[in-house]
């Protein structure tokens, strides 16, 4: 009810419609279906290569750029007081859920700063949001959403991806962020991520059973 109220106040009919569809998809569902739908869309023990939920798969960058981008993401989290695990080699800071949560965190901090008349904090949060939208989530959310809509058998994930894209793009317009967007996922598998995860990825875990990697 609170989320719907906030969207209604904004007067954004497109976002409100997307939220209502997401809400309905959740109400008509259960945990088992959502778990199955997640694995079918994003993979399980391995990443689904036709719909990865990680930024680095969409950038198609060289290894030096991949490590720099991941370091930049981690650095932004730390700059705003979010602690990262130092020794967890499998920690993925570029997961779409983590990046969207960070965007929510900055939005909340900005709202708090506005309410408490902190001009310096407002500028810090606004600047952080603009940078994160421009360099990270704003670049690949469209391609990610398109991949999800095409692949997922579960309407909940289709509507969630659609709502996320609408929200991110509305924020980009509001903050005058002109990111160089990736329109479509091209099936990249960055070398760095392959080594990070220990093996190549497939939409079907069983397909990986006989594959061996050094």
Write out the residue ranges for each language-model feature.
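Surface/interface-facing alpha-helical segments and adjacent flexible terminal/loop regions used
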Residues: 1-214
């Amino acid at each position: 009810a609170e989320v719907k109220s906030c969207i209604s106040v904004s007067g954004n009919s497109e976002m409100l419609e997307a939220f209502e569809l997401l809400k309905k998809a959740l109400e008509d569902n259960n945990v088992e279906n959502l778990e199955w739908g997640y694995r079918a869309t994003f993979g399980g023990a391995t990443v689904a290569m036709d719909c990865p939920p990680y930024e680095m798969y969409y950038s198609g960058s060289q290894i030096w750029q991949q490590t720099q981008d991941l370091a930049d993401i981690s650095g932004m989290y730390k700059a705003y007081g979010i602690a990262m695990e130092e020794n967890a080699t499998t920690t993925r800071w570029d997961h779409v859920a983590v990046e969207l949560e960070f965007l929510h965190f900055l939005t909340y901090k900005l709202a708090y700063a506005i309410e408490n008349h902190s001009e310096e904090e407002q500028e810090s949060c606004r600047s952080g949001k603009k940078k994160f939208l421009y360099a990270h989530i704003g670049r690949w959310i469209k391609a990610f959403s398109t991949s999800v809509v095409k692949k997922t058998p579960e309407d909940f994930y289709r509507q969630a991806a659609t709502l996320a894209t609408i929200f991110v793009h509305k924020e980009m317009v509001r903050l005058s962020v002109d990111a160089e967007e990736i329109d479509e996922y091209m099936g990249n598998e960055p070398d760095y991520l392959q080594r990070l995860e220990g093996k190549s990825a497939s939409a079907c875990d069983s397909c990986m059973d006989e594959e061996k990697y050094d």
